[in-house]
Structures are given as structure tokens and as C-alpha cells.
Amino acid sequence: MSKFWFDMTEDIIPNHMISVDVKDMPEFFQQEKFDGNSMMCRKLEMLPIECIVRGYITGSGWESYKKTGKVCGIELPEGLKESDKLPEPIYTPSTKAEIGDHDENISFEQSVTHLEKYFPGRGQELAEKLRDNTIALYKKCAEYALSKGIIIADTKFEFGLDEEGNMVIGDEMLTPDSSRFWPAEGYEPGHGQPSFDKQFARDWLKANPDNDWTLPQDIVDKTIGKYLQGYEMLTGKKL
């Protein structure tokens, strides 16, 4: 799925993908188990910001809005309902936490300061590019997804710098692991929405707090099914 989106958005920003064909990869990866599951990429210096964009109000954003009328410090119109589409997508960056810790939501101004620590003299420039690329990518991909019957409620991008210092999108892109995908059919604000992403598994875990964090096989199978359905709707291909 990342390859699909990388190919679609090359006009906005370059990506780190070199090839998904195992024949192009080192000999060790030229095995059946890696075919279709691997991507060879350029090495990047990753930027220490999680670039989150929200087109609809849901999840932690909804919880924050109910309490404060804001999401990550951004004031939103009064009277929004859960799952409402926002007037414009909002950019809500966070820091990248160490493994085991939680990412911290920060303002745009704080992202400038944070980046300046790692890239002296480039904090403002990099923060603006992260924000602008994030919004541009979301708008293009959300419009396409909607034409295929899927709402991208929110997502996360990660960017890095190549050897020349140019910004490149890396990691994965617009998969069900980093995005909320809702079916457009039956979309109705005022409550949570069914989804084609990991929220299904999360909801089961929340409903079963005494579980030992082992998902039953039927929940695993249903989650896989939702991932596949989202992929097939978006790409028109079957796996």
C-alpha cells in the first residue's frame, strides 16, 4: 500500500522507495517469504517529528475538543459532533518518543524549537516544509480515497533528509497502521465510525480489559480482512 501512495504523490515530494522487487535486493532477501512484504529504501536522516494531520474530529482529538474546544491547542468551531469533517485539515505535530514512552503533542511553534535543536538554523524552514507537505499529501490522497469510497479521517507521516539535505517522505505511508480509514457509505457524524484499520483490534482490547493482550484468532482474522478490504478498495487490486 505504501508503494501505491508513494507513486501517486511523487509530484508533491520525493520518497525513499528504491524498489519492492526482491530481485533488486541483496541476495538474502531474494526469498519467497520476502516477496510482496519488502521495500528497499534510501537511507535518510529522519526528522524528530511525527507529522499528524486530521481531517475529521475523532479519537484523542474528539476527547480534547469536548473538554477544551481545541485540538492540540488549535481552536475549532463550536458545536462539532464526533466524526464531523473539519472545515480544513489541521496539522498537529508530536515529538518522537523513545520506545516505551508516549509521543508528546506540540504546537507548530514548539516544533520549530524542537527541530532547531537538531538542525541549527533550519528549524523554521523545516517546520514549515513538514506542515505544508503534510497538508498537501493529505488533501490529495483524501480526495482520491473518497472517490473510492473511503474516508481518511486522519493519518501520520514521517520525513527525513537525504544526503543533500533535501526533504523526503520515509517510513510507511497511509497504511491502516498509521491512518484511520472509514467507509464513506453510511458515514454519519455523531458517533464513532466503522473502520478498515487497527481500531477494530483496539476496540476489542478496550472491551476486554482483563485479557492478557493475546488477540483471539477470529479477531486477528477479522482485522486482516479489514486491512485487505481497505487495500482492495483503494488500489483496485487483490492480494
Describe the residue ranges of each PLM region.
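Active-site loop/lid in soluble adenylation, ligation, and acyl-transfer enzymes
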Residues: M1-E98, N211-L239
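A long amphipathic alpha-helix within ATP-dependent nucleotide-binding catalytic cores
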Residues: F119-A153
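Intrinsically disordered, low-complexity acidic/polar segments
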Residues: W62-E63, E164, S178-R180
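Short, charged/polar micro-motifs that form catalytic or ligand-binding hotspots
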Residues: M39, K43, R131, T155
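Conserved metal-phosphate-binding beta-hairpin within the catalytic cores
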Residues: V53, I152-M173
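Anionic ligand-binding catalytic core segments
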Residues: K67, P77-E125, I169, M173-L234
